[in-house]
Amino acid sequence: MPLAVDLLHPEPQREIRCHKLKRLVQHPNSYFMDVKCSGCFKISTVFSHATTVVVCVGCNTVLCQPTRGKAKLTEGCSFRKKQ
């Protein structure tokens, strides 16, 4: 009796929605990112699930606010994931 789903080659969308420990290859949902300030254009490294308010080193503007999950970036700030 064949399975309805291929367990060795899961669909990417299904793999993303799956719990981090039940994936084929386990990996966390969190990451570090470079955030560029919209005022002084300095780059700061921020954790994606930061639990404190992160301010810019150069101009003391707020870069991100903590939520119960991922940190919410301030409008105008751009970011990229670190590898």
From Swiss-Prot:
<dbReference type="GO" id="GO:0008270">
    <property type="term" value="F:zinc ion binding"/>
</dbReference>
<dbReference type="GO" id="GO:0006412">
    <property type="term" value="P:translation"/>
</dbReference>
<feature type="zinc finger region" description="C4-type">
    <location>
        <begin position="37"/>
        <end position="59"/>
    </location>
</feature>
<keyword id="KW-0689">Ribosomal protein</keyword>
<keyword id="KW-0687">Ribonucleoprotein</keyword>
<dbReference type="InterPro" id="IPR000592">
    <property type="entry name" value="Ribosomal_eS27"/>
</dbReference>
<keyword id="KW-0479">Metal-binding</keyword>
<dbReference type="InterPro" id="IPR023407">
    <property type="entry name" value="Ribosomal_eS27_Zn-bd_dom_sf"/>
</dbReference>
<dbReference type="GO" id="GO:0022627">
    <property type="term" value="C:cytosolic small ribosomal subunit"/>
</dbReference>
<comment type="similarity">
    <text>Belongs to the eukaryotic ribosomal protein eS27 family.</text>
</comment>
<dbReference type="GO" id="GO:0000028">
    <property type="term" value="P:ribosomal small subunit assembly"/>
</dbReference>
<protein>
    <recommendedName>
        <fullName>Small ribosomal subunit protein eS27</fullName>
    </recommendedName>
</protein>
<keyword id="KW-0862">Zinc</keyword>
<keyword id="KW-0863">Zinc-finger</keyword>
<dbReference type="Pfam" id="PF01667">
    <property type="entry name" value="Ribosomal_S27e"/>
</dbReference>
<dbReference type="GO" id="GO:0003723">
    <property type="term" value="F:RNA binding"/>
</dbReference>
<dbReference type="GO" id="GO:0003735">
    <property type="term" value="F:structural constituent of ribosome"/>
</dbReference>
<dbReference type="InterPro" id="IPR011332">
    <property type="entry name" value="Ribosomal_zn-bd"/>
</dbReference>
